[in-house]
A protein has these predicted regions:
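Short, charged/polar micro-motifs that form catalytic or ligand-binding hotspots
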Residues: 69-76, 117-121, 160
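Short, surface-exposed "cap/lid" segments of acyl-processing enzymes
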Residues: 52-106
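Residue in the alpha/beta-hydrolase core beta-strand immediately N-terminal to the catalytic nucleophile
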Residues: 159, 163-164, 194
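Gly/Ala-rich beta-loop-alpha elbow adjacent to hydrolase catalytic centers
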Residues: 131, 162, 166, 170
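Histidine-centered divalent metal-coordination motifs
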Residues: 70, 163, 282
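Active-site micro-motifs of SAM-dependent methyltransferase domains
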Residues: 74, 167, 200
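Lipolytic serine-hydrolase domain surface
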Residues: 1-46, 59, 80, 95-156, ...
Length: 323
């Protein structure tokens, strides 16, 4: 499996194609450098550099790419395990349609969820600068001779799923990209952006807020939320420390969907999330709880990926309840 990361390796940060890459799990500081790698056995991966990774993505038989931004307190092995399940479900639903590409940002390895939460929140914000460089590198590659833009350009569609605090990484990435690299707003880069159990304030996608850039960069933005998500309930309580009392987007959906751009949609998962992930009801976008069968949230996402529309039969519909 290919992946991109801004976690420090135990080796030097100097990139070199073909070298061994081993995560330094005791260092959760985001690196300014970004590493383009391929997974290996026993935690020993291989750095292949950006040109080789983009070449492999371009030459893949899959028609679409699905970037995966994981949540807080997820170490690389867990991220790869979930990404592999995501790839398996995509292949079962429609072979050669989707290639899953995880983006691994640094989560803490300390004991104690509260301490981890604050360390990871800082890492999420700082990771935005690193992954903004990834987007800029992709734009450079897309227009370079390596992509043969005038002969056989890469036409794969790009989708993104961000879970929990991964949505904070997404928001900060687009903000940093817009501030430092772009002249007049972000380009329409993503076909679908799926924000699952998003650990950001529920006004994030409102017009005028920082997260509005997510809707500018996406054809569709789909928010999956559940009011009984225990992990986000704890998150809201933890954020009171910083005097942030607003509810989380993954708890309620947008505070007022009429104040969000028209390409933002919301999906109420309250009836299924705890049966898929007991007892917290937070990790509900993969299986139906048995680890083997696709759940309704995954099926809904995959239908959006294939069709490119959230509600193809009713262009005015913006909400649905999964049961």
């Amino acid at each position: 499996m290919l992946f991109i990361t801004n976690r420090f390796p135990t080796q030097s940060i100097r990139s070199r194609k073909g070298r061994r890459f081993t995560f330094d799990l005791n260092n959760n500081a985001p690196s300014n450098s970004v590493f383009y790698c391929e997974t290996g056995s026993d935690g020993h991966h291989t750095e292949i550099t950006s040109g080789e990774l983009l070449k492999r993505v371009r030459e893949s038989e899959c028609r679409q790419i699905l970037l995966y931004l994981h949540g807080f307190n997820n170490l690389p092995d867990v991220v790869f395990e979930r990404a592999a399940m995501l790839q398996k479900f995509c292949d079962e639903a429609k072979p050669k349609e989707v290639l899953v590409l995880p983006l691994v940002w640094p989560c803490d390895n300390d004991k104690g969820v509260v301490k981890d939460y604050w360390d990871d929140q800082k890492s999420a914000d700082q990771s935005g600068y690193s992954f903004a460089r990834v987007l800029e590198r992709f734009m450079e590659w897309r227009n370079s001779s390596d992509n043969e833009p005038d002969v056989a350009p890469c036409l794969k569609r790009i989708n993104l799923i961000s879970h929990s605090m991964g949505n904070r990484v997404l928001r900060q990435t687009l903000a940093a990209w817009d501030q430092y690299d772009l002249a007049s707003g972000v380009p329409l880069l993503l076909r679908n952006t799926f924000m699952v159990a998003a650990d950001v304030v529920n006004e994030t996608l409102h017009e005028g807020q920082l997260g509005e850039l997510i809707s500018h960069a996406s054809r569709n933005v789909v928010v999956y939320y559940a009011s009984d998500d225990l992990a986000l309930r704890a998150s809201k309580a933890a954020n009171l420390r910083n005097k942030v009392a607003s509810r989380r987007l993954g708890h309620t959906g947008p505070e007022n969907i009429k104040r969000t751009p028209r390409n933002v949609f919301q999906v109420d998962c309250d009836d299924i999330n705890t049966s898929y992930d007991r007892p917290t009801g937070h990790m509900y976008f993969l299986s139906n709880g048995n680890g083997k069968t696709q759940g309704q949230v995954f099926e809904h996402m995959f239908e959006c990926i294939v069709n490119g529309r959230v509600f193809p039969d009713d262009p005015d519909q913006r909400s649905i309840i999964l049961k």
